[in-house]
From Swiss-Prot:
A GO cellular component entry from the record: chloroplast thylakoid membrane
Species this chain originates from: Ipomoea purpurea
Lineage: Eukaryota, Viridiplantae, Streptophyta, Embryophyta, Tracheophyta
Any Pfam family: Proton_antipo_M
Stretches that traverse the bilayer: 3-23, 37-57, 84-104, 113-130, 134-154, 167-187, 208-228, 242-262, 274-294, 305-325, 330-350, 385-405, 416-436, 462-482
Gene for this chain: ndhD
NCBIfam families per UniProt: NDH_I_M (TIGR01972)
Protein name per its UniProtKB record: NAD(P)H-quinone oxidoreductase chain 4, chloroplastic
Length: 503
């Protein structure tokens, strides 16, 4: 048995190493950029080594467990552990954060603080995915608020303060429900309050109280996911944030809410989840259609991509509500798939804006000839977004689709109706994606404009785009590479779920 604190090192290393950035030389930003990038690469290598040599894929139990006393009065411990649900999001966090650091090269104002905030987010995100203590989960959840708020309010567009304030109000409001739920779970049914996640999993709750807990946690996670109607902060945030920040938001932050729904709502409250799962499927289906139609009407490029993210999150919600192993595995695969695709689209949108200084689609057109590399990459990730066969999104959406069809909980006509509406959402995706490509790259508006000389993608942008495209294609061609991480854990969740239902 390995007692080396691998997870603690993985969690605390980025933020502690990032604090050194304030003591680096003042001359230029080159040293700061390279130092931060090296920290991210080293962290990713340590994480990959730990999971390759100290994690058993076929073991659904919690592995690499670490427990250290923290606050004795509340029995609050530093509890860390990983399983099949955690590994994928943690590796995704390391990969996207490393590339977002590379994408942040144009940031020159207050670069020390900028890169430190990115590393602080890195620690918070990994800490959340690895935490096995409810209070630690809440702390890591809240650790995201301040870095994201500062990244939004200090680096972004003209309305960045408005979008940052809207973000903090929504997420802080959701955090109140999360805190109330954590305290309620801790104080119920125990002589001594404990935040131990395992204790809460094995605890039975009265039906009414379980529903109240479920709703409280659901509101907190629905804000972060986001789920209708708590999604309105997302387009404003993406529309104003720097594209490296957008990569972290779309690639990782949104996935924290979906992870919380599976980790807490499904595992801790099976009876309530059984009651609310039909509503999750309905909301997810409506979200797909609504966000797709709204995306089609957006003039702002980044807002169009933001609404496409909301639409794709609908698949995750439907997969969680399907209560089948196929659907839940599809939802987990969609979390990873959209993490790559969403981050890449926002990066390419940002690099395009750096060159043409335009963000409205009706002002663009005709740049495909002048920027063929960016056109090729943008087209590739747009195809991945609309679930082209051979790309990761195709497998994820197909699994969710089959999951809802094979669900025994729902009536036959209900499944037919849901599948039909999902098919409409799938059809709407290429409409807004291909329309975006047509408005940006085709035509002659900018091609014939005076002084319309634009630089194409450089080595840095090309390397970053290809680095994301390769896993998207790899997962699309061999999805078992990701599914093998979660399939055993999903079976345990559902078997435990139905066992608790019988009791």
């Amino acid at each position: 048995m390995n007692f080396f604190p691998w997870l603690t090192i993985i969690v605390v290393f980025p933020i502690f190493a990032g604090s050194i950035v304030f003591f680096l030389p003042h001359k230029g930003n080159r040293v700061i950029r390279w130092y931060t990038l090296c920290i991210c690469i080293l962290e990713l290598l340590i994480t990959t080594y730990t999971f390759c040599f100290h994690f058993q894929v076929d073991d659904p139990l919690i592995q690499l467990e670490e427990t250290y006393k923290w606050i004795n009065f509340f029995d609050c411990h530093w509890r860390l552990g990983i399983d099949g649900l955690s590994v994928g999001p943690i590796l995704l966090t390391g990969f996207i954060t490393t590339l977002a650091t590379l994408a942040a090269r144009p940031v020159t104002r207050d670069s020390r603080l900028f890169h430190f905030l990115m590393l602080a987010m890195y620690s918070g995100q990994i800490g959340l995915f690895a935490s096995r203590d409810l209070f630690l989960f809440f702390i890591m959840w809240e650790l995201e608020l301040i870095p994201v708020y500062l990244l939004l309010s200090m680096w972004g567009g003209k309305k960045r303060l408005y979008s940052a304030t809207k973000f903090i109000l929504y997420t802080a409001g959701g955090s109140i429900f999360l805190l109330m739920g954590v305290l309620g779970l801790t104080l119920y049914g125990s002589n001594e309050p404990t935040f131990n996640f395992e204790t809460s999993v094995n605890q039975s709750y009265p039906a009414a109280l379980e529903i109240i807990f479920y709703i409280g946690f659901f509101i907190a996670f629905a804000v972060k996911s986001p789920i209708l109607p708590l999604h309105t902060w997302l387009p404003d945030t993406h529309g104003e944030a720097h594209y490296s920040t957008c990569m972290l938001l779309a690639g990782i932050l949104l996935k924290m809410g979906a992870y919380g729904l599976i980790r807490i709502n499904m595992e801790l409250f099976p009876h309530a989840h059984s009651l609310f799962s039909p509503y999750l499927v309905i909301v997810g289906t409506i979200q797909m259609i609504y966000a797709a139609l709204t995306s089609l009407g957006q003039r702002n490029l980044k807002r169009r991509i933001a609404y496409s993210s909301v639409s794709h999150m609908g698949f995750i919600i439907i997969g969680i509500g399907s209560m089948t192993d196929t659907g839940l595995n599809g939802a987990l695969l969609q979390i990873i798939s959209h993490g790559f695709i969403g981050a890449a689209l926002f990066f390419l949108a940002g690099t395009t804006y750096d060159r043409i200084r335009l963000v409205y689609l009706d002002e663009m057109g005709g740049i495909a000839i002048q920027m063929p590399k960016i056109f090729t990459m943008f087209s590739s990730f747009s195809m991945a977004s609309l679930a082209l066969p051979g790309m990761s999104g195709f497998v994820a959406e197909l699994l969710v689709f089959f999951g809802i069809i094979s669900a025994k909980k729902y009536l036959f006509m209900s499944k037919i109706l849901i599948s039909f509406v999902m098919a409409i959402g799938i059809i709407l995706t290429p409409i807004y994606s291909l329309s975006m490509l047509r408005q940006m790259f085709y035509g002659y508006k900018l091609f014939n404009a005076p002084n319309s000389s634009f630089l194409d993608s450089g080595p840095r942008e090309l390397f970053l785009s290809i680095s994301i495209l390769l896993p998207v294609i790899g997962i699309g061609m061999y999805p078992d590479f990701v599914l093998s991480l979660s399939v055993e854990k999903v079976e345990v969740i559902l078997s435990h779920f139905f066992y608790r239902q019988v009791l």
